[in-house]
């Protein structure tokens, strides 16, 4: 006890004398589970072997065993991931620690360990004292292939930290490494630098006591680079870059400030966050025209588990010399569209220039049944009531911690829930064998071998029959991308994506239905439930999960020309892609010679349905704003396909019937049966392939040369934009020859400045001239004959967002929209300085506005994110 008092006294004195001192932990455990010798990791930290006195003496015989990874990707460090301790039964570690809050970090690498254990199929629970940290947890379902995982928790402990691993039925548990680190007293429970936890949506501040545990969900260095554990301020935390969480393109600006010295204080000592966090930040930008910032927000989206409360810690520090007094920069803070702080003035609250500060907020993310992993949205928007010097906002860091519920539970659901964990393929138990057990084992093995041989024969025959129908490989994924090991829930490592048959597709990618379930969902494929018919077959409206979930069920017809190849392509593509503007594949069925794909249900059908309305009396036309929002959403989906995955994915069949609309008219790209993986190396510029697509939308350069690039999708999307504007078919015979081709007709009218005469008549009183001009510019650039003259989808997204901003700005100013004055930048087919300027400016995402107290939040579409979340092929977060 005296030693503890002396340590605390020393820390307090050092904080007074030198506020820049990092924290020195009093408890440090780095356990390399399963290893027999101490080893140093890549950062120079020393990991020790398991001390027998830390292991429970109550464990049954053979409760655990150790093994080495049979295969380890080059990007995965050997310490602590080469060795593992594997548990057959409940197993408890007991660590003697000083009273207080502790970091607990668990290290996992799901791979095969020897011949005894395949961690990919492992399901287990983890408890610490009275807290449930993980329940029926699958490491493999939580991260991409060939990645490692670190789960970080913060738990209050009296004198012993009891860590228990419990395998789920018919499964084993495992762990590679255990880390326990102490922290400053009540560092995450007392609140921000002002010792307050602001309770968002409530009038009373939130208090945290020792009955609560945390899970670190995100820790982000906003505007800066990744900060590794040894770069932290003594607690070995890991800070990610924020680029993967930003909403919109070119969101904000990062100031270029060098030589900044942070002046830590008693309220914000150096251990709160390293200098790398406080010396970097993200601003809204637009310094020369700050009023532009009133039209958008700085927005981040973070996927979290529904049904939990979260502590969101925001870090701030004013490091720009021009912000040197109170009132220079004032902004509002929102979480999930709820106002959390109306007037945030970092200079005033922190006390001045280069003085760091941090605030804590408690945010509840309700389980509303719409999503298992909703986005926790963080918005910063300028506060304009007091006319600050700069309409701007600033943020340096974000930490998001999940709070345990009243039962002490922190465990969320696995990304793909399963009714029960799969049994281990090989789970031998060490112990004394008996000869009487040998004969039954031999009989079982022989019988299984015969059954397996018969099954393989059937599969081979089916596959040969399918390949006879189609010998073109639509997805070339033979190249094995490099791996990456990272921290926490945001793991962007990838592994081999070799094509698999549908029946062997991992269940964590999508759900496999039996034909009985499919027939039950569609009332045995009842004809009146058909909601669409295409080249693949019929699409049925159905219900799964006892009628709780509406789905779209696409069934391959025996006479379909597309056949099994497109079925496999779409299954292979969509099972690995997750984006809010791509239709979600829920599962598939390949029983009884049936080929069925199950998607999320899109209540508002296709974009074509709403452009070419059958019943114009009961089906109102889409407004110009809604058309822009739909186009932006579809463009973001294509943008993700082109730049957000490990390799470029080319859709090849973009058209209005393949853009679906959900209940909120959010656009989602669908039908990936013709999709191809683009160039897989820097030396490749295109893919040579047989021409496929839909007449009218087909890229003429692709048709002539059979050379496929992502610019082919850009062309098809440009045709969609023209349909949205003019609301007429691409080809018409009952019109004069000069009007027969939509693309030529629009180009001709654009050059003659008469586009206002050919747009959809329903838009005449709604569309604004400046918005239409920019929309036409980008649409016509998309449909240039030469692919090199077409813009990338990044530019298309930005231009459409800008068109939406121009429309809303003009509406606010009550511009006269009856007279449309088009000012084309030049003849179609040329690029002028005016067009270059259109795609070189910087702006943020623009959306509708809502008002809370006097603070205006510009509400963007949170579905555009990014994140987006965790999936196996993510490579460039900014492309989200």
From Swiss-Prot:
Bilayer topology annotation: Single-pass type I membrane protein
Compartments, record wording: Membrane
Gene3D superfamilies xref list: Galactose-binding lectin (2.60.120.430), Phosphorylase Kinase, domain 1 (3.30.200.20), Transferase(Phosphotransferase) domain 1 (1.10.510.10)
Signal sequence residues: 1-21
Residues linked to a glycan: 46, 136, 158, 210, 256, 263, 297, 324
Entry-linked SMART domains: S_TKc
CDD domains xrefs: STKc_IRAK
Keyword entries, A-Z: ATP-binding, Glycoprotein, Kinase, Membrane, Nucleotide-binding, Serine/threonine-protein kinase, Signal, Transferase, Transmembrane, Transmembrane helix
Domain Protein kinase: 525-810
One Gene Ontology term, aspect cellular component: membrane
Stretches in topological domain Extracellular: 22-440
Residues annotated for ATP binding in this entry: 531-539, 554
Positions on the Cytoplasmic side per record topology: 462-880
Enzyme class: transferase
Family assignment from sequence similarity: Belongs to the protein kinase superfamily. Ser/Thr protein kinase family.
Protein name per the record: Probable receptor-like protein kinase At5g38990
């Amino acid at each position: 006890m005296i030693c503890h008092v002396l340590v605390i006294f020393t820390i307090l004195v050092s904080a007074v004398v030198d506020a820049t001192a990092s924290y020195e932990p009093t408890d440090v455990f780095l356990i390399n589970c399963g290893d027999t010798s101490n080893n140093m990791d890549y950062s120079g930290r020393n990991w020790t072997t398991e001390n027998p006195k830390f292991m429970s003496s109550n464990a049954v015989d053979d409760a655990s065993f150790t093994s080495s990874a049979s295969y380890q990707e080059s990007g995965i460090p050997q310490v602590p991931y080469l060795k593992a301790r594997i548990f057959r039964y409940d197993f408890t570690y007991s660590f003697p620690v000083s009273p207080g809050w502790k970091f607990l970090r668990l290290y996992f690498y799901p791979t095969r360990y020897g011949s005894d254990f395949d961690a990919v199929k492992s399901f287990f629970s983890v408890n610490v004292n009275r807290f449930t940290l993980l329940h029926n947890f699958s490491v493999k379902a939580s991260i991409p292939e060939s990645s490692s995982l670190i789960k970080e928790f913060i738990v209050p402990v009296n004198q012993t930290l009891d860590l228990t691993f419990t395998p789920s039925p018919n499964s084993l548990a495992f762990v590679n490494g255990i880390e326990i680190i102490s922290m400053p007293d009540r560092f995450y429970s007392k609140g921000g630098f002002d010792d307050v936890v602001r309770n968002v949506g409530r009038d009373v501040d939130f208090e945290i006591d020792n009955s609560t545990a945390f899970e670190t969900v995100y820790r982000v260095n906003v505007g800066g680079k990744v900060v590794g554990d040894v770069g932290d301020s003594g607690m070995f935390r890991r800070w990610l870059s924020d680029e993967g969480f930003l909403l919109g393109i070119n969101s904000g600006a990062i100031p270029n400030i060098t030589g900044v010295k942070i002046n830590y204080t008693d309220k914000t000592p150096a251990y709160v966050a390293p200098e790398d966090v406080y010396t970097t930040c993200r601003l809204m930008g637009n310094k020369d025209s700050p009023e532009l910032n009133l039209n958008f927000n700085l927005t981040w989206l973070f996927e979290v588990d529904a049904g939990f409360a979260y502590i969101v810690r925001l870090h701030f520090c004013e490091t720009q010399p021009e912000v040197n007094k109170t009132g220079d920069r004032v902004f509002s803070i929102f979480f999930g569209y709820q106002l959390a702080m109306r007037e945030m003035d970092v200079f005033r609250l922190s006390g001045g220039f280069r003085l760091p500060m941090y605030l804590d907020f408690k945010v509840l993310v309700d389980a509303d049944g719409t999503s298992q992993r909703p986005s926790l949205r963080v918005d910063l928007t300028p506060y304009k009531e007091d006319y600050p010097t700069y309409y701007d906002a600033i943020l340096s860091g974000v930490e998001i911690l999940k709070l345990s519920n009243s039962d002490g539970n922190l465990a969320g659901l696995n990304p793909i829930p399963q009714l029960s964990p799969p049994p281990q393929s090989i789970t031998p138990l060490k112990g004394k064998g008996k000869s009487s057990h040998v004969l039954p084992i031999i009989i079982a093995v022989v019988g299984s071998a015969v059954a397996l041989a018969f099954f393989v024969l059937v599969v081979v025959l089916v596959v040969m029959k399918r390949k006879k129908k189609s010998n073109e490989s639509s997805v070339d994924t033979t190249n094995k991308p490099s791996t990456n090991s990272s921290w926490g829930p945001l793991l962007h490592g990838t592994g081999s994506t070799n094509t698999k048959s549908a029946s062997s597709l991992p269940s964590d990618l999508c759900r496999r239905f039996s034909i009985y379930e499919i027939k039950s969902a569609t009332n045995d494929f009842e004809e009146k439930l058909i909601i669409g018919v295409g080249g693949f077959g019929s699409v049925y409206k159905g219900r799964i999960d006892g009628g709780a979930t509406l789905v779209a069920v696409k069934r391959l017809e025996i006479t379909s020309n597309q056949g099994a190849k497109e079925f496999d392509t779409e299954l292979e593509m969509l099972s690995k892609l997750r984006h809010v503007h791509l239709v979600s594949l829920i599962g598939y069925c390949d029983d009884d010679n049936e080929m069925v794909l199950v998607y999320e249900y899109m209540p508002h059908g296709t974009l074509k349905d709403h452009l070419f309305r059958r019943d114009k009396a009961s089906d109102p036309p889409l407004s110009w704003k809604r058309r822009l929002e739909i186009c932006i959403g579809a463009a973001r989906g294509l943008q993700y396909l082109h730049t957000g995955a490990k390799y470029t994915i080319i859709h090849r069949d973009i058209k209005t019937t393949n853009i679906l609309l959900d209940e909120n008219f959010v656009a989602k790209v669908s039908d990936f049966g013709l999709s191809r993986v683009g160039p897989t190396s820097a030396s490749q510029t295109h893919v040579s392939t047989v021409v496929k697509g839909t007449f009218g939308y087909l890229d003429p350069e692709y048709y002539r040369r059979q050379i496929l690039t992502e610019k082919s999708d850009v062309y098809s999307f440009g045709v969609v934009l023209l349909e949205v504007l003019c609301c007429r078919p691409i080809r018409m015979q009952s019109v004069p020859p000069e009007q027969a081709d939509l693309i030529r007709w629009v180009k001709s009218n654009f050059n003659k400045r008469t586009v206002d005469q050919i747009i959809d008549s329903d838009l005449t009183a709604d569309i604004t001239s400046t918005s239409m001009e920019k929309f036409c510019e980008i649409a016509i650039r998309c449909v240039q004959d030469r692919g090199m003259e077409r813009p990338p989808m990044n530019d298309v997204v930005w231009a459409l967002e800008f068109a939406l901003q121009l429309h809303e700005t003009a509406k606010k100013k009550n511009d006269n929209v009856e007279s449309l004055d088009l000012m084309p930048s030049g003849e179609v087919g040329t690029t002028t300085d005016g067009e270059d300027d259109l795609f070189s400016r910087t702006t943020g995402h623009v959306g509708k506005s809502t008002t809370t107290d006097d603070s205006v939040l510009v509400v963007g579409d949170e579905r555009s994110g990014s994140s987006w979340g965790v999936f196996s092929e993510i490579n460039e977060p900014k492309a989200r």
